[in-house]
């Protein structure tokens, strides 16, 4: 059963890192859109704004131009939805792995 626990731990870590990577890709895509629209002068500001908006921190020290502020609202809503979905998905994986481990212990 030690092997099953190890495999489950690895699967959980892979799921967590995979979801983190997908969120990072989403943040980079939003930053690329902001650069494409010339909303920010460089990648650093675009990524900073995108990250703080995606995770709904929004410090307010870097803002979008007036004509494209609705994109920030959309990204924030997108981040809330996808982080919530990812959390539910992650705990679904953990629950299924625990059930599988329990079934393996029963024989």
Segments and roles (model prediction):
Residues 1-20, 83-107:
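Cytoplasmic (intracellular) domains, linkers, and terminal tails of multi-pass ion channels
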Residues 2-14, 40, 63-71:
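Juxtamembrane/transmembrane-helix boundary motifs in multi-pass membrane proteins
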Residues 3, 11, 25, 32, ...:
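A generic structural signal for ordered alpha-helices
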Residues 16-24, 74-81:
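Hydrophobic alpha-helical transmembrane segments of multi-pass membrane proteins
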Residues 20-49:
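Outer-pore turret/helix-boundary of cation channels
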Residues 45-101:
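Pore domain of cation channels
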């Amino acid at each position: 059963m030690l092997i099953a626990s190890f495999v489950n731990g690895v699967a959980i870590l892979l799921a967590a890192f995979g979801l983190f990577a997908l969120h990072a890709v989403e943040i980079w895509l939003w930053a690329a859109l902001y650069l494409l629209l010339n909303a920010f002068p460089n990648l650093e500001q675009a990524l900073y704004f995108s990250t703080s908006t995606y995770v709904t921190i929004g410090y307010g020290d870097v803002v979008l131009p007036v004509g494209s502020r609705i994109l920030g609202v959309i990204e924030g809503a997108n981040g809330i939805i996808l982080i919530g979905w990812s959390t539910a998905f992650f705990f679904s994986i953990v629950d299924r792995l625990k059930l599988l481990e329990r079934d393996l212990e029963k024989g």
